[in-house]
Amino acid sequence: MTQIGSFDLEKKTAVVAVILEKPLENSKKAAEKGADILEIRLDLLGIRTPERAAEVIREIKAETGIPIIVTSRSGAEGGKWDGKEEDRTGLLINLLSLKDGPDAIDIELSAGMKERNRVIKAAKDRETAVIVSSHDFLKTPPLQNMRTIIEEMFLAGADIAKLAVMPLSVGDTLNLLRVTLDFKDAGKSVCTIAMGSQGKHTRVVAPFYGSVLTYASIESNASAAPGQLPVDEVKKIMEMLK
């Protein structure tokens, strides 16, 4: 069974609201709009210290009670972290030591193996869900390459493998959905996203092929990735398609 906090991903796809500014205010808004999980983007929030990160997580949990994913995305994968890699992974590991810390940690497959493994081990030791992610903002890899990337994520220790790609054609999007369904049929928990206007519909369609998470913005004019839709719109459309 794959869970993030109390949310059982085997029963329902979670709508994840991405918090990239005004963390407490926007977390409350996300809760009001029906978000199932919050992703706290430490890099976009400009949070660099364990003390400030811990304070934000405690405040949000106290006010919303919603499960939290924490990540600090590297520049190579579309994030704003500009410090040392060991400081970035050290920040995540420090948060995992909190009594009421994050419910899931997201670490990139492209992170150095030593640092990535440290984060994953710390999460496993504390029974915290591990998301291993990969983001390609330029293209969609060939079908078999996408399968290989996801398999590598599970070999690295992922509970959930997250793959975000940039489709350049309808065929690219179909290939991503094909891969999603293949891993669903194999009993694996994946999150797949086709970014940009070509893949915008996958935000609400991929869950029907097996994507266990779909990421959404708080407002339509403030998204963390190309093609992200607002939380309330995602919830509404997914309900209509059930």
From Swiss-Prot:
Binding-site residues, 3-dehydroquinate: 39-41, 73, 203, 228
Coiled coil feature spans: none
Major enzyme class: lyase
GO molecular function, one term: 3-dehydroquinate dehydratase activity
Catalytic residue list: 135 (proton donor/acceptor), 162 (schiff-base intermediate with substrate)
EC number: 4.2.1.10
Reaction catalysed by this enzyme: 3-dehydroquinate = 3-dehydroshikimate + H2O
Keywords tagged on the record: Amino-acid biosynthesis, Aromatic amino acid biosynthesis, Lyase, Schiff base
InterPro entries given in the database record: Aldolase_TIM (IPR013785), DHquinase_I (IPR001381), Type-I_3-dehydroquinase (IPR050146)
GO biological process: 3,4-dihydroxybenzoate biosynthetic process; amino acid biosynthetic process; aromatic amino acid family biosynthetic process; chorismate biosynthetic process
Pathway membership, UniProt: Metabolic intermediate biosynthesis; chorismate biosynthesis; chorismate from D-erythrose 4-phosphate and phosphoenolpyruvate: step 3/7
Oligomer and partners: Homodimer.
Function: Involved in the third step of the chorismate pathway, which leads to the biosynthesis of aromatic amino acids. Catalyzes the cis-dehydration of 3-dehydroquinate (DHQ) and introduces the first double bond of the aromatic ring to yield 3-dehydroshikimate.
Homology family: Belongs to the type-I 3-dehydroquinase family.
Protein name: 3-dehydroquinate dehydratase
Organism (species): Methanosarcina mazei (strain ATCC BAA-159 / DSM 3647 / Goe1 / Go1 / JCM 11833 / OCM 88)
Lineage: Archaea, Methanobacteriati, Methanobacteriota, Stenosarchaea group, Methanomicrobia
